[in-house]
């Protein structure tokens, strides 16, 4: 807050909220004073307390009534500079009303302005209520002096009327081109035009002019433009009649000319109506007259050409049909049209696609009108194509399925060789247990390879000495060798891939007969095993190979020794225990899948295999290659194989019994060292029970070490088989 300088506007006329921080002057002595300090104007006022104002005052606030005086609280400022007509109390002090009087001349001027505005509004209302052309001209002349602004609506309308009148005069005097259709209409309206020019002030004729003149200027101008374009396009056809009629009207009277022009435009409108009616009525039928031909036919031809229809052939029958009354065309109901469409759809479904083009031209000779044909070609043709495609796809799918079924039956017939009857009998229940996808996995090439290998091996009577050379294995592979238990019955074991990489080594299977050792090996190709791995997941295959064991074996397994099946990709905690238990499980023949610890599913066997397990040779003690002292990482695997498979197969029941006792003793040692939980008597009972159920059949499992090359593995296999 400063005591010098310019005044604070809010301090003197309102309230300043800044207080001492305000840079402008706050002076109590100058409150309510409206006199400007002359020294401040010159810049020489250095008084601390100056009673005069230090700001430019351009308003006489003493003549302006105070706003707060009329409010409920009243004006509460003791030094209010505005005019007060009433006395007021401020802080207990009575302040009389202002001595100055408000000036009266401005009020009278305002009254004059208000009166002028009222008269103008009345004039506007009168002009709007009487929109006849004569009265418009008169009101325009009378009100042109009083209208303050040129944007007044009646002025705009009258100015447009003047321009219109000038255009009408020029068109009547200069241009002599009128259509012959309009001339009789003008002659018909001749009497109305003459009466309207002579008796324009009569009320009845004013009503007529009101009815005819209600149309806006834009509509009339549009009609005139259309008439001019028609005249220019058609040429001067009706020259001599119209100028005579226009000369009969006195030109200098503007009002008369205006009414004549309005009636002429109305007659032109009435003259145009029959042409439009003719066009609408004769659109579906014959074209009569040159005007209708000019307006209607080129559009129809262009549409027909767009649709690709033949114009010359189809036009004549269409016109003959159009000669019928219009009611016959519209007689058809929705149901009839739908029935026709349904019939045509049925025809198109049976007929090939080449008939679609013919359908566009055929309805010209039939009963149906052409618009329905157009609808048919666009929307329904697409629907028909979609239906055809769907039907073709369905037929292709059905043919494909029938071909696949026929191929499956052929494969089954090819798989049935006369030399191996028992194998096929046991293949069917295993396939019933497995899902249907396994039937479609094997290709023809794989089946042919298997058949060729079987024929070759049965001719040579030699078990598969070496597997097909493949890439080096990156993970664990399980190759199962199954032996015949009883004559005429045999188990089929598929090669199980228990690693993630899609490479496989074929599994030699050694079926044999006790009476005559017909040893055959079933070798699956690399592609077959890879596809089986990709399409059948490992856990599902394990669960389906490990089907239900008889109830007696389940109870004994649960009660005495928990032998668990584990997917071969998972890792065990202790490698030594896993290896030992794998060897122990190798001797117990009831397990079909790889037997490993730390898993939930227990060993089971399908009942179809139980019938086949009657008597089988056992592996001797030295056939197991065991390394009990060496610890391996969980990924390392041991190679385990029954080396003397052929000699054991060819031996009799006596040798099998002696070998079985040795293997039971070996299994007893392995299970006691590996598990270390069950006592020896329990394990003896368990081994005896399994031996009784299996009938002496053994299954050897080969675990291939991924660290070795294929050549080394094949050499070891051949040595074991030869020994």
From Swiss-Prot:
Biased composition (Polar residues) is annotated at 511-522, 637-649
Q: What is this protein called?
A: Zinc finger CCCH domain-containing protein 11A
Summarize the protein's role. Through its association with TREX complex components, may participate in the export and post-transcriptional coordination of selected mRNA transcripts. Binds RNA.
> Subcellular localization, per the record?
Nucleus speckle
Q: Which gene encodes it?
A: ZC3H11A
Which parts of this chain are annotated as the region Disordered? 142-208, 223-256, 404-428, 450-526, 565-681
The UniProt entry, under SMART domains, shows:
ZnF_C3H1
- Which key words tag this protein in UniProt? Coiled coil, Metal-binding, mRNA transport, Nucleus, Repeat, Transport, Zinc, Zinc-finger
Question: Which species is this record about?
Answer: Gallus gallus (Chicken)
């Amino acid at each position: 807050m400063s005591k010098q300088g310019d005044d604070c506007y809010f301090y003197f006329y309102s309230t300043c909220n800044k207080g001492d921080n305000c840079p402008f002057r706050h002076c109590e002595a100058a409150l309510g004073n409206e006199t400007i300090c002359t020294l401040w104007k010159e810049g020489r006022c250095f008084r601390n307390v100056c009673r005069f104002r230090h700001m430019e005052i351009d308003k006489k606030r003493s003549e302006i009534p105070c706003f707060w005086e009329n409010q409920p609280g009243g004006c509460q400022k003791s030094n209010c500079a505005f005019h007060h007509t009433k006395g007021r109390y401020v802080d207990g002090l009575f302040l009389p009303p202002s001595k100055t009087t408000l000036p009266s001349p401005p009020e009278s001027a305002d009254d004059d302005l208000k009166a002028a505005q009222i008269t103008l509004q009345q004039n506007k209302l009168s002009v709007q209520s009487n929109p006849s052309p004569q009265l418009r001209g008169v009101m325009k002349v009378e009100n042109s002096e009083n209208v303050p602004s040129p944007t007044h609506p009646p002025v705009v309308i009258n100015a447009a009327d003047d321009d219109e009148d000038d255009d009408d005069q020029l068109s009547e005097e200069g241009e002599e081109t009128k259509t012959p259709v309009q001339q009789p209409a003008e002659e018909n309206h001749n009497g109305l035009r003459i009466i309207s020019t002579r008796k324009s002030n009569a009320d009845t004729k004013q009503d007529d002019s009101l009815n005819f003149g209600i149309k806006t200027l834009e509509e009339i101008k549009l009609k005139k433009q259309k008439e001019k374009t028609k005249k220019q396009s058609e040429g001067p056809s009706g020259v001599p009649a119209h100028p005579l009629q226009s000369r009969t009207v006195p030109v200098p009277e503007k009002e008369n000319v205006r009414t004549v022009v309005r009636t002429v435009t109305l007659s032109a409108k009435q003259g145009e109506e029959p042409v439009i009616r003719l066009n609408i009525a004769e659109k579906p039928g014959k074209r009569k007259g040159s005007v209708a031909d000019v307006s209607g036919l080129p559009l129809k031809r262009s549409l027909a050409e767009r649709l690709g229809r033949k114009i010359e052939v189809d036009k004549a029958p269409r016109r003959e049909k159009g000669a019928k009354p219009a009611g016959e065309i519209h007689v058809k109901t929705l149901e009839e049209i739908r029935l026709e469409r349904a019939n045509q759809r049925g025809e198109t479904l049976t007929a090939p696609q080449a008939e679609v083009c013919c359908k566009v031209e055929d309805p010209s000779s039939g009963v149906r009108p052409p618009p329905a044909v157009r609808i048919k070609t666009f929307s329904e043709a697409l629907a028909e194509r979609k239906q055809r495609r769907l039907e073709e796809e369905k037929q292709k799918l059905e043919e494909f399925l029938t071909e696949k079924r026929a191929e499956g039956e052929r494969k089954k017939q090819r798989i049935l060789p006369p030399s191996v009857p028992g194998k096929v009998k046991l293949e069917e229940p295993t396939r019933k247990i497995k899902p249907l996808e396994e039937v479609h996995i094997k290709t023809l090439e794989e089946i042919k390879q298997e058949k060729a290998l079987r024929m070759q091996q049965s001719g040579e009577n030699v078990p598969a000495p070496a597997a097909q050379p493949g890439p080096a294995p990156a993970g664990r592979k399980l190759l199962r060798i199954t032996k015949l238990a009883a004559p005429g019955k045999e188990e089929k074991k598929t090669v199980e891939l228990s690693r993630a990489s899609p490479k496989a080594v074929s599994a030699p299977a050694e079926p044999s007969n006790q009476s005559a050792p017909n040893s055959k090996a079933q070798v699956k190709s690399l592609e077959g095993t890879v596809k089986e791995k990709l399409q059948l997941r490992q856990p599902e295959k394990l669960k389906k190979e490990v089907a239900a064991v008889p109830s007696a074996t389940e109870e004994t397994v649960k009660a005495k020794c928990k032998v668990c099946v584990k997917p071969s990709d998972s890792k065990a905690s202790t490698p030594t225990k896993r290896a030992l238990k794998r060897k122990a499980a190798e001797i117990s023949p009831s397990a079909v899948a790889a037997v490993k610890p730390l898993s939930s599913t227990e060993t089971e066997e399908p009942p179809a295999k139980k019938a086949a397990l009657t008597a089988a040779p056992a592996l001797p003690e030295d056939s197991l290659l065991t390394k009990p002292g060496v610890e391996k990482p969980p990924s390392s695997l041991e190679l385990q194989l029954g080396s003397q498979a052929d000699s054991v197969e060819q031996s009799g029941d006596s040798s099998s019994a002696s070998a079985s006792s040795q293997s039971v003793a070996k299994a007893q040692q392995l299970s006691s060292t590996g598990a270390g939980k069950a006592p020896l008597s329990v394990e003896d009972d368990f081994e005896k029970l399994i031996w009784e159920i299996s009938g002496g059949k053994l299954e050897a499992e080969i675990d291939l070490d991924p660290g070795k090359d294929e050549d080394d593995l094949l050499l070891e296999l051949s040595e074991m088989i030869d020994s």
